[in-house]
């Protein structure tokens, strides 16, 4: 095989923009060291703007540069692809103190090239001539420096034209997403970004994987594919306004249109105690198209969901008589405990007592009612019943989550996702009415109940960590804890507790509730006096954080 020196000039940047037609590469020519003669065939990028393999965001698009160890592939006269064996990238970088990139480069490649056109491929630093791997786990260490894309999935193709010397325009064929979150929310002031995760609602989608690539840059035959990509970053800051210099983070993904796309930002949030909280903030998009060779900017104002303080009730208390009625956080006379371990017996409802003239916030008094006691008729009348709670518990595919939210001036992370009732009904060939009438074991526990607090407690330990893929099929409940004797606040940010509409059929002090934490969901009968949340199964998105 003969060696022939072929000059490849002008790597022109194909538009990598916010829209499919606008070119936004505003790079200017950079000064570098003189070209160093080597043996072999020469491929050279000389004219700006040029397509390269490291990227920075300019405010209107991605500007690319060559980095150390970049390689290209060229098809010779025998239709065999050869990888460049040498280049002058290192010399050019060394000629500019402090630089890690260069605007120009020459590559030397073996092979025989006599045609007027030769195919060129770039398959990333770890690619073969016909294989591209877009990684599911990517890392960017410095804001607005996406040098990692060469390692994590960037690829492109070109037609080199000429005679003796060849020029080509390298067309990037990967899709790029540049995240630039900011926040106007004081709850997360000073927070750092740890990672950004994006996934689609269809687990069969191929956001990442290993693919075959043809001369047109079209991908096929994916293996080890996934619908989720995670970009780990190095404690990027979150400014109060969009600033690409502060935190632009670029992800490489497979081009395509994806539905029910979730973008999850994992943050480390400082707290007054000095111990930071790690949690997530998530945005959901119904449909997103990532075009080949284009960059999609994502500019998001990150905010935490703030839950109300007046949503705790004893079981079926009078409508409007929440646990701290008249003394709520934020009221004219705030006496409500706001952090775990605080209590206020002076202003709390009377311990273990039903509603009375002196205890208007107490639970419904059934001491004189005939058994079985009727379902809730007041504040808990629209809550799910015990049978529905058991369907959620055992057929709701619970997923624990660390989504961030706030309550009474403090930030917390923790909650549970459950399948929506309509999804559960469809998957189990039931109607909504049938879910209300009997539990999964075909028993109506509204009539039978059980002895609470013991071995009869219904427990599901099969809880999956992390959000489900298709969030539209699920609803969310936060771990808002509860109030107990003497108004003691417990388990805020740790445990979720919700009343049902179902009293124990014969015990006037007991009612059913559903509760959960990171590894367990349970349904049980317990004391009616607990200050828990109310949940209406016909309004499942009431607590949804985004």
Locate each region found by the language model.
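Sec-type signal peptide cleavage vicinity
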Residues: 2-394, 399-406, 412, 417, ...
């Amino acid at each position: 095989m003969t060696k022939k020196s072929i000059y490849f000039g002008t790597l022109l940047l194909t538009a990598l923009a916010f829209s499919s037609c606008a070119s936004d590469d505003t790079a200017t020519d950079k000064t570098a060291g003189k070209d160093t003669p080597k043996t072999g065939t020469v491929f050279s990028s000389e004219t700006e703007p040029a397509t390269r393999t490291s990227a920075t965001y300019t405010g209107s698009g991605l500007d690319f540069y060559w980095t150390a160890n970049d390689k290209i592939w060229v098809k010779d006269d025998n239709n065999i692809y050869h990888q460049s064996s040498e280049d002058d990238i290192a010399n050019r970088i060394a000629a500019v103190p402090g630089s890690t990139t260069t605007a120009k480069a020459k590559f030397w490649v073996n092979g025989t090239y006599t045609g007027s056109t030769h195919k060129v491929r770039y398959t990333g630093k770890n690619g073969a001539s016909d294989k591209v791997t877009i990684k599911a786990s990517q890392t960017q260490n410095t804001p607005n420096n996406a040098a990692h894309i060469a390692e994590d999935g960037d690829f492109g193709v070109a037609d080199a034209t000429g005679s003796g010397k060849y020029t080509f325009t390298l067309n990037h064929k990967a899709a790029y997403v540049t995240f630039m979150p900011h926040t106007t929310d004081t709850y997360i002031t000073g927070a750092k970004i740890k990672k950004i995760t994006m996934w689609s609602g269809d687990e069969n989608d191929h956001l990442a994987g290993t693919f075959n690539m043809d001369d047109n840059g079209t991908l096929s035959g994916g293996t080890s594919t996934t619908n989720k990509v995670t970009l780990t970053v190095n404690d990027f800051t979150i400014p109060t306004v969009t600033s690409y210099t502060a935190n632009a983070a670029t992800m490489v993904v497979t081009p395509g249109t994806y539905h029910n796309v979730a973008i999850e930002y994992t943050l480390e949030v400082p707290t007054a105690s000095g111990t930071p909280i790690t949690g997530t903030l998530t945005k959901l998009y119904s449909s997103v198209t990532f075009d080949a060779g284009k960059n999609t900017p994502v500019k998001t104002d990150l905010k935490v969901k703030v839950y109300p303080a007046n949503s705790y009730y004893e079981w079926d208390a009078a409508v409007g008589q929440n646990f701290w009625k008249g003394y709520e956080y934020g009221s004219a006379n705030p006496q409500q405990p706001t952090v775990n371990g605080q209590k206020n017996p002076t202003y709390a409802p009377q311990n273990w007592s039903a509603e009375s003239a002196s205890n208007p916030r107490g639970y419904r008094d059934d001491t004189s009612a005939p058994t079985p006691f009727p379902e809730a008729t007041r504040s808990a009348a629209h809550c799910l019943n015990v049978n529905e709670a058991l369907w959620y518990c055992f057929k709701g595919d619970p997923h624990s989550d660390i989504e961030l939210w706030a309550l009474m001036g403090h930030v917390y992370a923790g909650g549970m996702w459950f399948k929506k009732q309509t999804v559960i009904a469809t998957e189990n060939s039931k109607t909504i009415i049938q879910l209300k009438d009997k539990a999964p074991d075909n028993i109506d526990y509204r009539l039978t109940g059980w002895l609470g607090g013991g071995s009869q407690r219904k427990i599901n330990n099969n809880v999956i960590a992390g959000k489900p893929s298709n969030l539209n099929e699920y609803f969310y409940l936060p771990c808002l804890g509860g109030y107990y004797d003497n108004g003691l606040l417990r388990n805020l940010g740790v445990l979720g507790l919700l009343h049902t509409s179902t009293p124990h059929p014969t015990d006037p002090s007991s009612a059913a509730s559903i509760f959960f934490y990171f590894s367990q969901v349970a349904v049980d009968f317990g004391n009616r006096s607990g200050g828990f949340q109310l949940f209406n199964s016909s309004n499942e998105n009431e607590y949804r954080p985004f």
